[in-house]
Structures are given as structure tokens and as C-alpha cells.
């Protein structure tokens, strides 16, 4: 068999003429080699993905799937808060710190990795409070859109206190606006916040550039906390729609950043909508479908819906639709009330007065079920998915001795809950529901 002759001549480079031999450029050949990371198996597998890892629709799909699946696999880790009384408000500061406010008027930060508690000094009014003053505690903590300022209650529960983030240095106190306790706060821009009070009014506060720069300058000169005092920019009373004006107390606020609209819930069972930009202008007031114990409100931007908690229902309101179109869902927690509510993706998380967390799927229009039967309160597969708070701490005071000593464990109302930025950690806090009982609960579900 004759062997075919094979030419060992190198192919001429493009552009070389006939009979010309191109030089072999070894340095150019080396420069064209793929970088090591592109030769890896990881790079090869990532190149085969159906969607790029930074594709927004793909990420939204993943977040939605996680939001629906995660509640069924969450496990609880309790924190010990000492003798603090009832955690009413909370917000994540970063991936490991949560700031909280209590009924005993304590502002503190808890490290969810170590459990360490750090108390933050609360800010005082221009004039000292009278000796007869009685505090209701800190009911609201809110962070502005750029996460540079935090607003909460002051030493006087009628006043709003603003801190700088991430240092929690004091910036200013807004005093002289309300005659009664502040129940809720909402930021309507990076420098403007609205407070809602038990006196039936809403106050608009502005942290001007002058206030912020002055605060920076004073902190640079003094080792003692120094802060400004500001007055409200606008003050509006909610409409007295009911026959009992005493119940016209602003209980909760939620802001729609897209339409610049502020929703407010009052204890007389009404929902109020305001245009909130440089001032507050009323748009509408409507009677709620369930008007007992309306103490919590949240806005879902993606769904253009307000969620309002009541004694046993969560009602979903779309201000663009007639009031009779509002949909309500029964939470099977008759008598204890809905104490906190929030949106994450298509899941509405509901905290109850009986220490339960429920999860409502807006798309499926039903509560999530326990698909495994492994949750603490589930007896059978397919039961309603319900997470129950731990024992917490309870002071066996005179109230407990007289009325509750025969009860082994008093459930802790979920007064506040919040997801971290990843949506994989849920901070839950509260305390005993009866007014005279003193106790606390805080836990991380992850």
C-alpha cells in the first residue's frame, strides 16, 4: 500500500501572495489563547444556561419560586432580649443587624449572628417632658429609599427622631407637631417623612440639606451627641368620617412611590388616600370591608394593592377600583387580630396576635399549605402552613398571677416582621398580646 504524501508546509496567512511563506508569530499565537477561566468546567456550564445570570426576568422568576417555597422550610432561632417589653417595630440595617423599638421606649440593634444587643440613645425634645408623661413606646421604624436616614420615635412618643445610617448618629428631632403618640412613619422621598399620630393628624417633616450638613459639622466637633430640632412642614387632620371622632386615630401608613400616594388607616375603620409630594392633599376616603382593629397596612408596588389587617381578615384595596371590589381573606385567627403584614414578591406574610405567621399567595389566591406535614402546627400534609413563634420571655408580674397563672404558655403576638434584602431571612418579633402583660419575643427564621 502506498502512503499518501502529506505536505508539512504551514498554511499561508490570509493576505500573503502566492509563493510567499508567512512567518510564524509565536507571541501573537500566545496572546490569542483563551484565558484559564474560560477553559474551566464552570465557565462551560454557565455558557449553557438558558438565561444569563443577570437577566432580570430570570431573577424575578427565581425570587418568586423562592418566596413560595421558602416558608415551608424555615426554622427558628430565638434571641434573648432580657427584660425588654414587647418589640413593636423592626428594620434590617444590613445582612446581620436589625434595629428594633419596644413598648418600654428602647431602641436597640440585634446582631443576628451573635445575638448581641446594643442599645441606641433616644433623642429628646427641646423642652423636658413633664413628670406625668407616660410613654407608649416606639411603634415605628422606617428607612429612607437611599438607606442613609432612619426615622423612629423619640423620648417623647409624640415626636419623630431621625438618625444617620450606617452610623446611627443623631440628626434631628421633629417636635411640636403632634399632641399624642406617633403610631406610624412613612418616607415619601429621601429627605421627607410623614408621621401619623393617635391625635388624628399627619405631619410632614423635611430634613433639609442645611440640617444634614450642620449635623455632620457638629458631630465632627463634639464627642457628645448633638442634633437639631425641626418643625413640621405641613400638618393635616384625617377626615372625621365616623360618628365617633374619638376613634379617628391614624394607626398605619404606607407609601406608593410610583404614584406618590400615601395610604393611611384610621381606627374608625376607614382607609384614606393622600397625594404626598411637597405637601399632603386628600384624594379619597373609603370604609373598610372589615373595620375592627385595623392596626397594620402595607403596599405591594408590583400589584398596586394595599393590604389592611383587621381582627380576622386581610383586605386588599386597589384605589383605582370601586370600594365594593375590595377582596378580603379570612385568616382563621378570630379574636386575636392581624398585627403585621408585608409583601414579598407574590407572597403576603401575615403576623397574628396568637403568635402565628401565615403566607398568602396573591397569584393563586389562597394561603400556602404545608406540603410535607413537618411544620410545628401541622397534623397532616396539606394543612394550612403556619409558623408559630417560640416561648420568648414573660414577666410573672401581678397581672400574670391574677389572670394568667393557670396558662402554661402565653402566645407572643407578631407585632413586627421583616425580610432581609435576599428574601431568605425573616426577622420576627413581638410579645404577649394582653396590655398588662410584660414580656418579649424575637427570632430569626431562616
Curated annotation (Swiss-Prot):
GO biological-process terms attached to the record: protein ubiquitination; regulation of autophagy; ubiquitin-dependent protein catabolic process via the C-end degron rule pathway
Taxonomic superkingdom: Eukaryota
Primary localization class, coarse: cytoplasm
UniProt keyword annotations, A-Z: Cytoplasm, Cytoskeleton, Nucleus, Repeat, Ubl conjugation pathway, WD repeat
GO function terms (MF aspect): ubiquitin-like ligase-substrate adaptor activity
Compositional bias per record (Basic residues), positions renumbered to this chain: 1-12
Subunit annotation: Component of the DCX(DCAF12) E3 ubiquitin ligase complex, at least composed of cul4 (cul4a or cul4b), ddb1, dcaf12 and rbx1.
Protein known as: DDB1- and CUL4-associated factor 12
Amino acid at each position: 500500500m502506498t502512503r499518501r504524501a502529506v505536505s508539512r508546509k504551514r498554511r499561508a496567512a490570509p493576505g500573503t501572495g502566492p509563493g510567499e511563506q508567512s512567518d510564524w508569530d509565536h507571541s501573537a499565537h500566545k496572546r490569542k489563547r483563551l484565558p484559564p477561566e474560560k477553559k474551566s468546567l464552570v465557565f462551560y456550564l454557565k455558557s449553557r444556561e438558558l438565561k444569563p445570570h443577570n437577566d432580570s426576568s430570570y431573577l424575578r422568576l427565581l425570587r418568586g419560586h423562592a418566596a413560595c417555597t421558602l416558608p415551608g422550610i424555615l426554622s427558628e432561632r430565638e434571641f434573648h432580649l432580657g427584660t425588654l417589653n414587647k418589640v413593636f417595630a423592626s428594620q434590617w440595617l444590613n445582612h446581620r443587624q436589625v434595629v428594633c423599638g419596644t413598648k418600654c421606649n428602647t431602641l436597640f440593634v440585634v446582631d443576628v449572628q451573635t445575638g448581641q444587643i446594643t442599645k441606641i440613645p433616644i433623642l429628646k425634645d427641646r423642652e423636658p417632658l413633664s413628670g406625668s408623661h407616660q410613654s407608649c413606646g416606639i411603634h415605628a421604624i422606617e428607612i429612607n429609599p437611599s438607606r442613609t436616614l432612619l426615622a423612629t420615635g423619640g423620648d417623647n412618643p409624640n415626636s419623630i427622631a431621625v438618625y444617620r445610617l450606617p452610623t446611627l448618629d443623631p440628626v434631628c428631632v421633629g417636635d411640636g407637631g403632634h399632641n399624642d403618640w406617633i403610631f406610624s412613619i412613612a418616607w415619601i422621598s429621601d429627605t421627607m417623612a410623614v408621621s401619623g399620630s393617635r391625635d388624628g393628624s399627619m405631619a410632614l417633616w423635611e430634613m433639609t440639606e442645611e440640617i444634614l450638613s450642620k449635623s455632620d459639622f457638629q458631630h465632627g466637633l463634639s464627642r457628645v451627641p448633638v442634633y437639631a430640632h425641626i418643625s413640621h412642614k405641613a400638618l393635616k387632620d384625617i377626615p372625621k368620617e365616623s360618628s365617633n371622632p374619638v376613634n379617628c386615630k391614624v394607626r398605619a401608613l404606607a407609601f406608593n412611590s410610583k404614584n406618590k400616594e400615601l395610604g393611611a388607616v384610621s381606627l374608625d375603620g376607614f382607609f384614606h388616600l393622600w397625594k404626598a409630594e411637597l405637601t399632603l392633599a386628600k384624594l379619597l376616603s373609603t370604609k373598610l370591608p372589615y373595620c375592627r382593629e385595623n392596626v397594620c397596612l402595607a403596599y405591594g408596588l408590583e400589584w398596586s394593592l394595599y393590604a389592611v389587617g383587621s381582627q380576622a381578615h386581610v383586605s386588599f384595596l386597589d384605589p383605582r377600583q370601586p370600594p365594593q371590589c375590595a377582596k378580603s381573606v379570612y385568616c382563621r385567627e378570630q379574636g386575636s387580630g392581624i398585627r403585621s403584614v408585608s409583601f414579598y414578591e407574590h407572597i403576603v406574610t401575615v403576623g397574628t396576635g396568637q403568635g402565628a405567621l401565615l403566607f398568602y399567595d396573591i397569584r393563586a389566591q389562597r394561603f400556602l399549605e404545608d406540603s410535607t406535614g413537618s411544620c410545628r402546627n401541622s397534623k397532616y400534609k396539606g394543612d394550612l402552613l403556619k409558623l408559630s413563634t417560640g416561648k420568648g420571655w414573660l414577666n410573672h408580674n401581678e397581672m400574670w398571677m391574677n389572670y394568667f397563672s393557670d396558662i402554661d404558655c402565653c402566645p407572643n403576638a407578631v407585632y413586627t416582621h421583616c425580610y432581609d434584602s435576599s428574601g431568605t431571612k425573616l426577622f420576627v418579633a413581638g410579645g404577649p398580646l394582653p396590655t398588662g402583660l410584660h414580656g418579649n419575643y424575637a427570632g430569626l427564621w431562616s
